[in-house]
Amino acid sequence: MRIVCLIEDTEGSEGKNGCAAAHGLSFYVETGAHRLLVDLGPSELTLKNAENTGTDLRDVDTVVLSHGHYDHSGGIMPFVRRNTKARIYMQRTAVGDFYSDDGESAGERFRYIGIDPEIADLPQTVAVDGDLRIDDELELFTVKHANHPIPFTNKSLLVRDGSGYARDSFDHEHYLVIHDGKRHILVSGCAHKGMPNIMEAYLGRYNAAPDIAISGFHLMKKTEYSEEEKREIGEIARQLNEYPTKYFTCHCTGMKAYEIMKSVMGDKLTYVHSGDVIPTDWI
């Protein structure tokens, strides 16, 4: 098994593999039966990073779009010009009118952050309704009940409807489970439904925790955290620490939140940068 972070918000140590950073996320995964991508970052830059890591995207057979935001989908249309065979799995609701409320001081307060609608019309796109078993190795699941708070940073993420803007419920978010021999790996994008809720849903579905969980935690802020927000981040870390899982995080977690969580979770939490390879041989 090989898992490579093709792009996220920070460059790898010492400019690892020459991979650039950008606000977005993409992982390449090799399993016994598949060559797959989870998200494709914000742009064609993801494809350039793939070349720098020696990843041949023409071999990819499966793409999973974690949710309907541009920073995870922007590389899809450039990708399909190189690879027309890979099936692209996304929730049917991922084609939505999604916006970010950037505040009163922004030049344009409500900024569109959804995907290119042409993605849904591609012949290789599979519109998923809820959970899906792809094959013996790959499954997709959704969170139907949230027993823990969702990230406080979700409050600025909206969906536009006929009467204006409403808080996004993130019913367009799903999570990939990889069963590769004895390894069981959970891959999420931003965990907008809350990583504790996702882990709880995984446990209820499989009656065990994953060996590895890879995800952004959507805790990044442009401004300083309040004391209450710091406490919430610490509580998320404590909840995740209860599972016998090794976590790899990136992208929308943000380094400040990562440092708070790292102080609680220690070696169970690692930050992954653009171009980094996630070790799996210890499982």
Task: Describe each PLM feature range.
Residues 8-10, 40-43, 68, 93-94, ...:
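Active-site metal-binding loops of divalent metal-dependent hydrolases
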Residues 2-53, 169, 173-188:
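Conserved beta-strand hairpin/beta-sheet module of binuclear metal-dependent hydrolase folds
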Residues 94-174, 265-283:
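Metallo-beta-lactamase
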